[in-house]
Design a protein with these regions (language model features):
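Positively charged, small/polar-rich N-terminal and surface patches that mediate targeting and assembly
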Residues: 2-153
């Protein structure tokens, strides 16, 4: 899949909420500690934002004029899944050619980006010990990719 996806606002519902044609979904393993779930979520979503800067909204500013960084301009759904469901979602994302960020168990033992890439590169895609992933693409494709996962509590 090329990097040409853009977030399109498809329509407004009667309540005024914006609906999107694209979706960002994060899956985290259901056996992780809370701090690990948060860490994985932050890392994999940063990959989506880095690869697709058009997803970022405008910078924020408070009433005092203090500037803040832009955030993703569309919602992110965070889901949990067991190891088998996560592995299946990974395979479906690859099959659909959806942009994806991954986090493996080995990455918890590293201390920087180069080491993270090294531990991922050392394992074939079918043998990755995935503990999380983020996927972005057309809403229906993402929904089919994360089938079987549950909303994170």
């Amino acid at each position: 899949m090329s990097g040409t996806y853009k977030t399109h606002r498809s329509r407004r519902s009667h309540a005024g909420a914006v609906r999107f044609d694209t979706k960002i979904a994060v899956l985290v393993r259901d056996d992780l500690e809370p701090w690990q779930r948060l860490n994985v979520t932050a890392f994999v979503v940063s990959g989506i934002a880095g690869a697709h800067p058009q997803l970022l909204g405008e910078p924020y500013e408070d009433a005092d004029g203090t500037a803040y960084l832009p955030l993703l301009g569309q919602p992110v759904v965070v889901l949990e899944a067991d190891a088998d469901t996560l592995k299946a979602a990974h395979a479906r994302a690859l099959g659909r050619e959806l942009p994806m960020g991954v986090y493996t168990r080995e990455m918890f033992s590293t201390g920087h980006d180069e080491a993270n890439r090294t531990v991922v590169r050392a394992v074939g895609r079918d043998d990755l010990d995935l503990v999380g992933l983020a996927v972005f693409g057309p809403k229906n494709g993402v929904d089919k990719t994360v089938k079987g996962a549950r909303l994170h509590p």
